[in-house]
Amino acid sequence: MVLTNFFLRKKTSTTASIAKKRLHIIVTERKIDNTPELNYLPKFKKDLLRIIHQYIHEPKKISIQLQEQDNNAYMLQLTISFLTKNQDLINSKKQDNTTV
């Protein structure tokens, strides 16, 4: 009798299974809500620009765009225009002439 009771009894919920159910509910609610949680992006963009400006001093050469993709995914696109080698040489010669 004890053996059949062991196999036929209801299993009690463990702490892990309760936490899993709660997490599932939260994830489902966020998917339904469809509000993107991108509060960190303005600060991220500002930090990224600050770091890039240490090396590139012309703001017109830097472009940052935020694009929405499918399924509420976002893409942050960073474009930096660099000088060619010839332009670098010309600019460096101009700087050398002005420092003499």
Swiss-Prot record:
Record's keyword annotation contains Hydrolase: no
UniProt keywords, alphabetically: Cell cycle, Cell division
Annotated TM spans: none
A GO biological process held by the record: cell division
Function, as annotated: Prevents the cell division inhibition by proteins MinC and MinD at internal division sites while permitting inhibition at polar sites. This ensures cell division at the proper site by restricting the formation of a division septum at the midpoint of the long axis of the cell.
Family to which the UniProt record says this protein belongs: Belongs to the MinE family.
Designated name of the protein: Cell division topological specificity factor
Name of the coding gene: minE
